[in-house]
């Protein structure tokens, strides 16, 4: 089971899985796409001009379109989702949401978390306070919504937990610093408003020291005057 965001990260993982399958490095098993992944992927095929050259050419040729590989299967219904949860044969499931805080991934988590033979692979950042972060950090028991009685029920986490680094939708520190050095006209002030507070403060200090720009990390509800 791989928790993913429907746009961007899903397609990156799909390309990796399709490549491994075509090279014979991935066992022959179905890959199920649950949530809005199928619809979001269709947009990538509909507008290949926005993809890199290699992928664009494959999409134009159609028969080589990796997004239309036979290994990918759309989860069409709740009943189909339940069938997948109950199957004994190996399978890979990509499901939203990426931080395991809602969406169809919760149903797979409910069914597979207690299973020693199941594995959850994280391919994206897990924000503080999310279910994804708790599982990633080794929680042995989680509480999930009880659909029948309301409230929550405890669920043991016996499945294997893996984190695959390298997938990122953001520029890294080096790329951001280079951007700030070359942007014209030169900004008068830089605001950092997305990220862990401690890392934002560290990055702001580096910007002030190395790029010589006024950089601030605003708090929630803080007002900053630009004029």
Residues covered by each model-derived region:
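Acidic/His-rich, metal-assisted hydrolase cores and their charged scaffolds
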Residues: 1-227
């Amino acid at each position: 089971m791989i928790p993913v965001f429907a746009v961007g990260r899903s397609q990156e993982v799909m390309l990796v899985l399709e490549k491994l399958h075509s090279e014979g490095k991935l066992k022959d098993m179905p890959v199920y796409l649950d949530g809005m992944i199928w619809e979001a992927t269709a947009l990538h095929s509909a507008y290949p001009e926005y993809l890199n050259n290699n992928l664009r050419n494959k999409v134009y040729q159609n028969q080589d379109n990796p997004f239309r590989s036979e290994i990918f299967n759309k989860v069409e219904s709740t009943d189909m989702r339940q069938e997948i949860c109950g199957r004994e044969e190996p399978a890979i499931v990509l499901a939203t949401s990426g931080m395991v805080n809602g969406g169809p991934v919760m149903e797979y988590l409910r069914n597979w978390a207690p299973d020693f033979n199941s594995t959850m692979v994280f391919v994206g950042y897990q924000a503080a306070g999310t279910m994804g972060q708790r599982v990633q950090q080794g929680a042995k028991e989680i509480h999930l919504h009880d659909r029948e009685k309301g409230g929550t029920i405890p669920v043991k986490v016996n499945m294997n937990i893996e984190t695959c680094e390298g997938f990122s939708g953001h520029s890294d520190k080096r790329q951001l610093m280079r951007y700030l050095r070359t942007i014209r006209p030169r900004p008068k002030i830089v605001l950092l408003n997305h990220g862990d507070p401690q890392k934002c403060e560290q990055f702001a200090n580096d910007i002030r020291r190395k790029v010589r720009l006024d950089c601030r990390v605003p708090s929630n509800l803080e007002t900053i005057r630009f004029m």
